[in-house]
């Protein structure tokens, strides 16, 4: 059976298990202390301390993904990120996402499992709202439309911050990776740029998308850097971590990168500063 058809018939349950494993992992991430930031000893690597399956979360995604009552909601996705909203809701962000319906067993492939039709809609990104541990709704998908033919946006880290420094109003800012279709080895797309989307709160309406780090001028795609693998706020700065795609081009290792932005200015390209190993450029 072709791999694409096999993948399409899977229900949300499988994703939920993977999601639980990823969320159960205890990842230790830290910024260097003041001395290290100014060129002192490099911070040591961090490793996974432990992990365990989050059964309640797995079951909730299985319930929501396998619900056959709607034809326009999430039934499975990858590239999972989440962000807590000021009103207590949790917003789940996904990259490639299946919509449509999931059907109960038996399925036409002869297995006793739920199944998804081969013509199920696939979008490049989606967002699902959770309240008090229960998934409520899928926002209109794709939430972030393709920037150009042959290109798409994958959401990564997200952060609630003031609309501008010191402003009382808060907004949600979502880091986006822009990729473009390309030949092997770029099976996940050629890196193009990092963007920042601003969403209003509490209605989660996309107000704008701004390109903050365009990489199209870097000739070697494996050296193009995308930001947003994760982020952390400290001392009035938002630190944004990123990386390149050297391993996609069979290089030994990919490299990590770091940028920082004053709190409230993630959507301003001129406010971004990049660590070059000895200072912020």
Where are these regions (language model features)?
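Beta-strand initiation motifs
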Residues: 45, 50, 129-138, 201-211, ...
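Structural motif
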Residues: 98-115, 182-198, 248-259
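N-terminal regions that are enriched for targeting/export leaders
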Residues: 30-179, 190
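Residues that flank catalytic or metal-binding motifs in active/ligand-binding sites
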Residues: 78, 88, 154, 192-195, ...
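Secretory targeting and sorting signals
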Residues: 3, 7-32
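Conserved catalytic-core segments centered on acid/base and nucleophilic motifs
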Residues: 80-85, 159, 199, 229-232, ...
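Short N-terminal edge-element motif at the start of the domain
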Residues: 187-188, 198-227
């Amino acid at each position: 059976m072709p791999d694409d058809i096999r993948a399409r018939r899977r229900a949300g349950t499988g994703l939920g298990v993977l999601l639980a494993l990823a969320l159960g992992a205890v990842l230790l991430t830290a910024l260097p202390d003041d001395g290290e930031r100014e060129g002192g000893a490099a911070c040591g690597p961090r490793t996974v301390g432990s992990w365990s399956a989050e059964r309640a979360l797995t079951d909730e995604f299985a319930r929501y993904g396998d619900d056959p009552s709607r034809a326009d909601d999430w039934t499975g996705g990858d590239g999972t990120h989440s962000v807590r909203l000021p009103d207590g809701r949790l917003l789940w962000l996904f990259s490639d996402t299946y919509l449509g319906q999931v059907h109960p067993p038996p399925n036409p492939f002869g297995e006793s499992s739920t199944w998804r039709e081969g013509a199920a809609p696939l979008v490049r990104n989606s967002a699902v709202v959770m309240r008090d541990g229960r998934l409520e709704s899928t926002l209109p998908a794709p939430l972030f439309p393709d920037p150009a033919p042959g290109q798409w946006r994958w959401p990564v880290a997200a952060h609630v911050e003031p609309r501008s420094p010191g402003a009382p109003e808060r907004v949600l800012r979502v880091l986006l990776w822009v990729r473009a279709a390309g030949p092997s080895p770029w099976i996940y797309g050629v890196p193009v740029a990092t963007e920042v989307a601003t969403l209003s709160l509490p209605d989660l309406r996309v107000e704008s998308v701004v390109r903050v780090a365009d990489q199209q001028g870097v000739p070697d795609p494996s050296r193009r850097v995308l930001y947003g693998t994760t982020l952390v706020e400290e001392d009035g700065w938002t630190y944004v971590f990123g990386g390149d795609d050297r391993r996609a081009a069979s290089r030994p290792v990919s490299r990590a990168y770091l940028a920082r932005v004053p709190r409230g200015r993630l959507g301003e390209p001129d406010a971004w500063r990049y660590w070059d190993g000895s200072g912020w450029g």
